[in-house]
Amino acid sequence: MTITKIHARSVYDSRGNPTVEVDIVTETGLHRAIVPSGASTGSHEACELRDGDKSKWGGKGVTKAVANVNDTIAPALIKEKLDVKDQSAVDAFLNKLDGTTNKTNLGANAILGVSMAIAKAAAAEKGVPLYAHISDLAGTKKPYVLPVPFQNVLNGGSHAGGRLAFQEFMIVPCEAPTFSEAMRQGAEVYQKLKALAKKTYGQSAGNVGDEGGVAPDIQTAEEALDLITKAIEEAGYTGKIKIAMDVASSEFYKADEKKYDLDFKNPDSDKSKWLTYEQLAEMYKSLAEKYPIVSIEDPFAEDDWEAWSYFFKTYDGQIVGDDLTVTNPEFIKKAIELKSCNALLLKVNQIGTITEAIQAAKDAFGAGWGVMVSHRSGETEDVTIADIVVGLRSGQIKTGAPARSERLAKLNQILRIEEELGDNAVYAGNNFRTAVNL
């Protein structure tokens, strides 16, 4: 079915920054996608094109990316008369039109908006939900797998004030029997945590960060983990709800000294207290012995490959590469060869097309890795990643706390998918790392 119209516009994300929205019109109607954007970004990500004009939106405008869709991509793609159901042909055409390896020319935000909208148009033409179309594109088997929601309930690092260096602490309801039950458990723990934070740290500690988590004035990881453990206990889920961390350690890595500064938000940080990667690895291991931690993301800096391989040999939990791999086939291949981690954080906007995102997941699955589909800190009401996580059978999604509509939009979409699929879907539960094989 041919495309009759492609139109992009600038809209706003959850942080009030401009982002790209793309409409594609075919005989089945209008198909719309909005692109997200990240706060702590890996240096090897596909290029998110921003205007750079400091007098407007602080330089974060996307009028160039929007113009690239309207003036360059739209006429070329319509003229090409490609079938919207042939996602790989469309994405290959977009990449060829851009002509660079990391989408610098047109912008990954321009290309991805089109790629996502194309997938929605194709699903409509086939008369199937988007997750079913993604499943066809990826060639995944049935039954469908509903993911474990990794809920970011407490923020530190560059997402929050306070001295806490680690960026995200997540609750993981992997013992729940169903996705909807996992959501209930997560929401109940979140409410307890919020009340506890206010009681312990004062009223303002209940305020939420970019991803819906609370950000009390916490100094150490232990303090954060104790608070979460207490909330889990008060909600009655001790032993049933696990914990995951996204350390985002590239943010506090001192490359010249090859050390990690856990007091990086303090300009007068004491250099003698900076840690080597071996010391940091020991810290993770002792935390994992004390608390029910099942997954650690970005435990080391994106260029500290030696540290990753060292940790991999000694830790048997899930080690997720995000800044390390940036959803990029070359870095994923390198991480597989060097045995750096055992799971991929899949952010569609890091690679810039649906086809390449699916391929990245397949590469990871092929190495026996887990795949966690992820939102970005600057999100929108677009729910494409909810359909992607179900279509890929990846079994784990990270899309914030059960708070803020742009986070809940994805989780609510998975609730609808769960209802629609009924017995044709299983909840990943404790098998979240190997869900693709269920």
From Swiss-Prot:
Gene3D superfamilies according to UniProt: Enolase-like C-terminal domain, Enolase-like, N-terminal domain
Keywords, in A-Z order: Allergen, Cytoplasm, Glycolysis, Lyase, Magnesium, Metal-binding
Binding residues annotated for Mg(2+), in chain numbering: D246, E297, D322
E.C. designation(s): 4.2.1.11
Co-factor: note: Mg(2+) is required for catalysis and for stabilizing the dimer.
Cofactor(s) annotated in UniProt: Mg(2+)
Annotated positions binding substrate: H159, E168, E297, D322, S374, H375, R376, S377, K398
Catalytic activity: (2R)-2-phosphoglycerate = phosphoenolpyruvate + H2O
Pathway: Carbohydrate degradation; glycolysis; pyruvate from D-glyceraldehyde 3-phosphate: step 4/5
Pfam families: Enolase_C, Enolase_N
Principal localisation: cytoplasm
Broadest EC class assigned to this enzyme: lyase
Name by which UniProt lists this protein: Enolase
Protein species of origin: Alternaria alternata
Lineage: Eukaryota, Fungi, Dikarya, Ascomycota, Pezizomycotina
